[in-house]
Curated annotation (Swiss-Prot):
Chief location of this protein within or outside the cell: mitochondrion
UniProt similarity note: Belongs to the cytochrome b family.
GO cellular component, one term: mitochondrial inner membrane
Domain of life of the native organism: Eukaryota
Recorded topology in the membrane: Multi-pass membrane protein
Locations listed in the record: Mitochondrion inner membrane
Lineage, broadest ranks: Eukaryota, Metazoa, Chordata, Craniata, Vertebrata
Cofactor(s) listed: heme b
Protein's UniProt name: Cytochrome b
Length: 396
């Protein structure tokens, strides 16, 4: 009696891990393009690590040479200009995908997979830290003053704040030691991100993906390859196309003009601001006139994502069938867009007042409005069931 042939990808100790994650993974049959952003983030991370390693071969972490070494990469290194443009604009694409991924998680209730969601929020915080220390490396005006302003905020932490700032700076101000430290952090953090991504995927595969209907999909699953692998590749093509188009046509469109000026500690830029993808958090920071309060608000702007699973009161998983919550969700998106714009404006009237209102709305939506709407919609559904007009199935 002949035995069926053994399939190496299913029996090999290492290949079987990849097989269970990328080939034979049971996936809900109805997941849409909004579920592509996880794989797009993996692509962005791989691209950033590759281009970053190439740039690190030519970069010099020294205050006297850092700015010149970046110019040397762009002018003298073969395709160095392309690597630098891909790395700089790749960060923007990275954060676009992150925000879309988080938005999808909020819209479709993916945060109810608490372990996966919490690891994802930690990944977001680590990515933000990586991007911040990377922004300092070219040693332009905005690099220097951004590092000075943001790191100085840590001094607001009671008792230990000043000591932490001194350790970060390696002295009494942002200096050569600071640049060396930041280059070290920027080099090692992406590899920590890659390890955390594996943990994120492991937790996800314990529960399986959610789906656009928000119901249990165990009865209708298909294998990941070839159905969703080709769908992901289509997303890769679009992302790479947009990234190369930006990097080749307007490569500096998303960069800060002041950062093309060599860092000068004696000349403060008229308006210090971070990259565009941090402007919403920077606006929330500036909305509080107190230093410690601003730091707490900045941390809360990201850490509030950890609270969402515990303030979920609706009997439905997502908001795709909840009109009131949908309106609130899109108000949140508009509010974030407004905060992003306000973060790039000077800290003066009327922008300060607008920022304070927008920041209050941001926190109110997560802490108060979403939970209240969840309970209200539960009551409306119960009322409609009692009147016999609709037959609702609320299990997920």
């Amino acid at each position: 009696m002949s035995h069926p042939p053994t399939i190496l990808r299913k029996t090999h100790p290492l290949l079987s891990l990849g097989n269970s994650m990328l080939v034979d993974l049971p996936s809900p049959a109805n997941i849409s393009a909004w579920w592509n952003f996880g794989s797009l983030l993996s692509l962005c991370l791989i691209l950033q690590i590759i281009t970053g390693l190439i740039l690190a071969m030519h970069y010099t972490a020294n205050t006297e040479l850092a700015f010149s070494s970046v110019m040397h990469i762009c002018r003298d290194v073969n395709n160095g200009w392309l690597m630098r443009n891909l790395h700089a604009n790749g960060a923007s694409m990275f954060f676009i995908c992150i925000y879309a991924h988080i938005g999808r998680g909020i819209y479709y209730g993916s945060y109810l997979y608490k372990e996966t969601w919490n690891v994802g929020v930690i990944l977001f915080a680590l990515t933000a830290a990586t991007a911040f220390v990377g922004y300092v490396l070219p040693w332009g005006q905005m690099s220097f003053w951004g590092a000075t302003v943001i790191t100085n905020l840590i001094s607001a932490v009671p008792y230990v704040g000043d000591d932490i700032v001194m350790w970060l700076w390696g002295g009494f101000s942002v200096s050569n030691a600071t640049l060396t430290r930041f280059f070290t952090f920027h080099f090692i953090l992406p590899f920590i991100l890659a390890a955390m991504t594996m943990i994120h995927i492991m937790f996800l595969h314990q529960t399986g993906s959610s789906n656009p209907l928000g119901i249990n999909s165990n009865l209708d699953k298909i294998q990941f390859h070839p159905y969703f692998s080709f769908k992901d590749i289509f997303g890769f093509v679009i992302l790479l196309g947009v990234l190369f188009m930006i990097s080749l046509l307007p490569p500096n469109a998303l960069c800060e003009p002041d950062n093309f000026i060599y860092a000068n500690p004696l000349s403060t830029p008229p308006h210090i601001k971070p990259e565009w993808y941090f402007l919403f958090a920077y606006a929330i920071l500036r909305s509080i006139p107190n230093k410690l309060g601003g730091v707490m608000a900045l941390a809360a702007a990201i850490m509030i994502l950890l609270v969402i699973p515990f303030t979920h009161t609706s009997k439905q998983r997502g908001i795709q069938f909840r009109p009131l919550a949908q309106v609130t969700f899109w108000i949140l998106i508009a509010d974030l867009a407004l905060l992003t714009w306000l973060g790039g404006e000077p800290a003066e009237h009327p922008f300060i007042l607008m920022t304070q209102i927008a920041s209050t709305v941001y926190f109110m939506i997560f802490i108060l409005i979403f939970p209240i709407l969840g309970r209200l919609e539960n009551k409306l559904i119960l009322l409609s069931k009692n009147t016999g007009k609709f037959n609702w199935n609320l299990t997920y």
